[in-house]
């Protein structure tokens, strides 16, 4: 399993991961383009919102490679909720009402899929006071944990099952093989 720092994966990264026999990458941020002061940018605006097996020469299209891209769950609210914001399934980047919107949107949009994935991301340092800009105090960490608890309870209420990225690869491979 691989996740590029600062979501900086590009076609070269994907080709290298395939060559090194990685099974899962989770570096893509749908609907986002990351600008760099150096002039180079990482553009994941074309990334699918749901997992797919990466095509080495066209990283936003499916292929029969063994590298599964599991993009972070980010929705473009301008298309669905009429306000200009990218909503992340990530603590400190969204509130519980936005998480509900994300879940409802993904479940509705992908209801015909064999499986649906919601991919939440956070750094372990965010659970340590003053180790992250998002949690500067124990009170911040406590609020963070309360938020995570609300998300997990909401997921449970919505019958969402938890899985590791490796387990998602196994599920995706099973459906890919069954549909050949």
Regions inferred by a protein language model and the residue ranges of each:
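Extended hydrophobic secondary-structure segments that form protein cores and membrane-embedded regions
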Residues: 1-4, 121-122
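Active-site-adjacent pocket scaffolds in enzyme catalytic domains
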Residues: 4-111
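C-terminal domain-boundary segment and adjacent tail
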Residues: 88-180
């Amino acid at each position: 399993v691989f996740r590029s720092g600062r979501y900086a994966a590009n076609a070269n990264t994907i080709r290298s991961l395939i060559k090194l026999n990685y099974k899962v990458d989770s570096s893509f941020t749908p609907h986002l383009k990351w600008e760099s002061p150096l002039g180079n940018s990482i553009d994941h605006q074309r990334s699918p919102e749901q997992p797919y097996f990466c095509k080495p020469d066209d990283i936003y299209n499916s292929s029969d490679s063994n590298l599964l891209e599991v993009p972070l769950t980010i929705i473009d609210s301008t298309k669905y909720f009429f306000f200009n914001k990218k909503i992340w399934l990530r603590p400190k980047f969204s509130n519980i009402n936005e998480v509900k919107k994300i879940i409802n949107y993904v479940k509705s949009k992908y209801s015909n899929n064999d499986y649906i994935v919601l991919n939440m991301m956070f750094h372990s340092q965010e659970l340590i006071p003053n180790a992250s800009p998002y949690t500067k105090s124990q009170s911040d960490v406590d609020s963070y944990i309360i938020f995570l608890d609300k998300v997990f309870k909401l997921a449970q209420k919505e019958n969402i099952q938890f899985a590791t990225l490796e387990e998602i690869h196994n599920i995706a491979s099973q459906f890919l093989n069954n549909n050949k």
